[in-house]
C-alpha cells in the first residue's frame, strides 16, 4: 500500500541492499526497475549523500527517499549526521522522507539509532514502526505510521489521507495485538525484557 498509492509517475529512492518488500513493491508500482542508492560495506554499510543528491538530480520523478534504520539486511545503525543529511537533501528538493524504524529498539554494542522524529524539522516525512520484531508474542503483528509535517505539502497530505482512508476499509485488522500495546508498553518489565534480548543478541 505504501507505494501503490503514490502518483503513478512518482518514484522512491531505495537503499541497496534492501529489505526486498520495499524494492519489489516500489518497482512494481512504477512498472520499472527500482531506483537504488548504495550502502557501502567499506563505509560500514552507510550511503554516500553525494550519490543520493546525484540520483535526485538525474531523476526528477523522485518524490521520496527511504531509509531503513537500523538497517535490514546489513544491521547498520545510521549515525545522526547521516540521517540529518538525508533529511537535508529531501528539504532542498521538496521531497519527503520514509524511515523504516521497525528495529529501532533492538540494537546492541552501545549503538542507538537516531529516529526521524528527532531531526525531521519542518520536512514532510513518515516513520514505519511496529511490534512484530520486538514483541514477546510469536506471530503477533501490528504496525503503524508516524506522520510528520503533513500540512507542509499539499500532495504529501493527499497521499497520507489516501493511505489512511484505504486502511479504514480493509478487513482483518490485528485487533488483539492492538489491544495489548498500551498495557505492554506501559509495563515496567517491558524495558528490561528488551534490554535482556539485546544483551543476548550482543553475546551471539
Where do the language-model regions lie?
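Conserved coil-to-alpha-helix start sites within the AMP-binding
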Residues: 18-23
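Hydrophobic residues in well-ordered beta-strands that form the structural core
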Residues: 14, 36, 97-99, 181
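Conserved core segment of the aminotransferase class I/II
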Residues: 118-199
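Active-site phosphate-binding strand-loop segment of PLP-dependent enzymes
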Residues: 39-112
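Short hydrophobic alpha-helical segments of the AMP-binding
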Residues: 25-30, 90
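A short helix->loop->beta-strand "cap" motif at the edges of active sites that frequently abuts
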Residues: 10, 31, 92-95, 122-123
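Phosphate-binding glycine-rich loop
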Residues: 1-11
Amino acid at each position: 500500500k505504501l507505494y501503490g498509492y503514490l502518483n503513478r509517475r512518482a518514484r522512491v529512492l531505495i537503499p541497496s541492499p534492501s529489505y526486498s518488500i520495499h524494492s519489489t513493491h516500489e518497482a512494481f508500482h512504477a512498472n520499472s526497475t527500482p531506483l537504488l542508492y548504495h550502502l557501502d560495506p567499506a563505509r560500514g554499510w552507510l550511503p554516500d549523500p553525494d550519490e543520493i543528491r546525484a540520483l535526485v538530480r538525474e531523476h526528477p520523478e523522485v518524490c521520496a527517499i527511504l531509509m531503513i534504520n537500523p538497517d535490514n539486511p546489513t544491521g547498520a545503525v545510521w549515525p545522526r549526521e547521516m540521517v540529518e543529511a538525508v533529511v537535508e537533501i529531501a528539504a532542498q528538493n521538496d521531497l519527503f522522507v520514509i524511515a523504516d524504524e521497525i528495529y529501532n529498539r533492538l540494537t546492541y554494542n552501545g549503538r542507538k539509532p537516531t529516529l526521524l522524529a528527532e531531526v525531521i524539522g519542518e520536512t514532510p516525512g513518515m516513520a514505519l514502526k511496529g511490534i512484530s520484531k520486538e514483541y514477546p508474542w510469536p506471530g503477533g503483528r501490528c504496525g503503524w505510521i508516524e506522520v510528520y509535517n503533513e500540512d507542509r505539502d499539499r500532495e504529501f497530505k493527499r497521499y497520507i489521507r489516501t493511505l489512511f482512508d484505504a486502511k479504514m476499509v480493509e478487513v482483518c485488522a490485528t485487533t488483539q495485538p492492538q489491544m495489548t500495546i498500551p498495557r505492554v508498553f506501559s509495563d515496567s518489565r517491558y524495558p528490561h525484557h528488551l534490554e535482556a534480548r539485546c544483551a543476548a543478541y550482543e553475546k551471539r
